[in-house]
């Protein structure tokens, strides 16, 4: 237990605080002492010697007073302390094995040599190197250090060996860095080759898919289901009004004998030959009214021609281009088999092509929808390609494009001529002149006392009678002033309403006339 100076027991908290305060004071004392030492070490002994030399010169002249003597004594003591502290600092650094180049000496100029010969030898510098630093210049922020003055064990050989080691390391690093440059083009070339390899197979992929799609359902379907599937697929679509007529079987006039001389021979027979080779799937599409294969091929050709005429006139909702190319590259049997798979997605219902109905040939009736659908897809080259050309319209007249509503209403409402574009708003062409009281040309000669604001411009008042003024016009000038004084009350009594600016101006003129101002 700690006690105070009076012998009282201290509070443990106060005792602890007092102990901490003692430690802090001791630490601050050491820090201040270090700061003093650093300040002494930073002082340049050469400057102190110059100041002492100046004081000695003034002493020789006999101008050294008591204050200067005291200053000289302080400078001598400071110089001794600086030399002593520097020696202690150098010895301490040597014992610790550290270089004496510290930040505290960075502000000092280079130390003077006792002889000029040592200044001419850069080999004595610690930073000397025969190739990297032949002049022995110190790095920025550090003072020049020499082996002769400080007595360091570091020699130029050691520095050169260390620098040689550093140079060898840098050379090895350069050699390591030189090897990688040829490596980057190799992976780039590999990537280019690997990127270019998958590109060539991409173009042949569509024909392979086009060939595989029709051949995948190559086995013929059963005789009964295909028409039923068509029936099941078509009811969800909106049936056109002519669908019952198209569902009827064609008349017996359509036969192979009638169709022999109707169409010239062409490349369609290639499709017919393929159809005969794969006849298992073809006779299932038409109804039992169609007799033979030849009769099937002929109406198919006529069907293709009707489809061509329909495309030339107007085509509505053409099939997508991708399935058409695939079907054109495939065989007829594969096309007939793939028709059952792509019919709900590719081919429109039989009535859609007839909206609006295309003009059929003169000597041919509309065939069965099943027969028409079977030969529509494998023969697209005979019609125009799908796209904007079949949907072209005649050039529109100049002006805004007519809408469907305007086209419908154009036949109902009568024609109303448009208003001429030159008609503008009926603005007045006559510029209104300003009032007389607002024009300076008219009111420049009127005195300010007479310029009374017109309260109501619309109110017009009759002019007062001027009989009295005319009767007084021939009176002597001595009596004119009295007459004018009498006229004013007469006017005010006669006119109960306020006078206008015109009345006041006429009264002013009459007064001037009565005074003789207007006499010639």
Swiss-Prot record:
Disruption phenotype: Early flowering in both long and short days associated with reduced levels of FLC. A motif (Nuclear localization signal 2) lies at residues 52-59. Residues 267-281, 300-312, 326-343 have a biased composition (Polar residues). Keywords: Flowering, Nucleus. It comes from Arabidopsis thaliana (Mouse-ear cress). It is found in: Nucleus. GO terms for cellular component: nucleus. The lineage of its organism: Eukaryota, Viridiplantae, Streptophyta, Embryophyta, Tracheophyta. This is Protein EARLY FLOWERING 5. A motif (Nuclear localization signal 3) lies at residues 71-78. The keyword DNA repair does not apply. One of its GO terms (biological process) is RNA processing. In seedlings, mostly expressed in the shoot apical meristem (SAM) and root tip.
């Amino acid at each position: 237990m700690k006690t105070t100076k009076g012998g009282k027991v201290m509070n443990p908290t106060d005792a602890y605080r007092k102990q901490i305060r003692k430690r802090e004071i001791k630490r601050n004392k050491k820090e201040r002492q270090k700061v003093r030492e650093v300040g002494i070490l930073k002082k340049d002994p050469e400057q102190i010697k110059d100041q002492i030399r100046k004081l000695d010169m003034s002493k020789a002249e006999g101008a050294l007073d008591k204050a200067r003597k005291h200053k000289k004594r302080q400078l001598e003591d400071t110089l001794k302390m600086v030399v002593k502290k520097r020696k202690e600092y150098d010895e301490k650094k040597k014992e610790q094995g550290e270089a004496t180049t510290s930040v505290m000496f960075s502000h000092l100029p280079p130390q003077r040599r006792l002889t000029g010969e040592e200044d001419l030898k850069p080999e004595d510098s610690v930073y000397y190197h025969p190739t990297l630093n032949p002049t022995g210049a110190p790095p920025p922020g550090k003072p020049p250090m020499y082996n002769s003055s400080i007595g360091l064990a570091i020699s130029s050989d050691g520095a050169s060996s260390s620098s040689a080691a550093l140079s060898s390391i840098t050379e090895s690093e350069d050699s390591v860095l030189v090897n990688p440059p040829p490596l980057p083009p190799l992976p780039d070339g590999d990537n280019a080759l690997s990127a270019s390899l998958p590109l060539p197979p991409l173009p042949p992929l569509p024909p392979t898919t086009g060939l595989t799609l029709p051949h995948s359902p190559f086995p013929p379907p059963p005789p009964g289901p295909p028409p039923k599937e068509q029936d099941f697929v078509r009811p969800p679509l909106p049936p056109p009004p002519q669908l019952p007529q198209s569902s009827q079987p064609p008349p017996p006039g359509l036969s192979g004998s009638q169709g022999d001389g109707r169409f010239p021979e062409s490349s369609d027979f290639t499709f017919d030959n393929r159809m005969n080779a794969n006849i298992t799937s073809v006779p299932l599409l038409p109804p039992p009214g169609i007799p033979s294969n030849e009769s099937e091929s002929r109406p198919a050709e006529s069907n293709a021609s009707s489809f061509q005429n329909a495309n030339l006139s107007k085509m509505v909702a053409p099939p997508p281009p991708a399935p058409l190319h695939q079907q054109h590259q495939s065989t007829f049997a594969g096309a007939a088999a793939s028709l059952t798979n792509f019919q709900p997605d590719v081919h429109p219902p039989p009535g859609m092509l007839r909206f609006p109905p295309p003009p059929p040939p003169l000597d041919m009736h509309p065939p069965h929808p099943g027969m028409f659908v079977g030969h529509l897809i494998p023969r697209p080259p005979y019609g125009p390609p799908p796209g904007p050309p079949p949907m072209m319209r005649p050039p529109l007249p100049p002006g805004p494009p007519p809408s469907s509503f305007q086209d419908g209403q154009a036949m109902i409402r009568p024609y109303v001529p448009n208003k001429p574009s030159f008609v503008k708003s009926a603005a007045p062409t006559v510029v209104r002149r300003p009032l007389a009281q607002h024009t300076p040309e008219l009111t420049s000669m009127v005195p300010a006392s007479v310029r009374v604001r017109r309260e109501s411009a619309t109110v017009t008042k009759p002019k007062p009678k001027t009989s009295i003024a005319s009767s007084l016009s021939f009176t002597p000038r001595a009596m004119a002033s009295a007459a004018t004084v009498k006229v004013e009350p007469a006017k005010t009594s006669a006119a109960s309403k306020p006078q206008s600016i015109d009345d006041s101006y006429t009264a002013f003129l009459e007064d001037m006339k009565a005074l003789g101002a207007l006499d010639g």
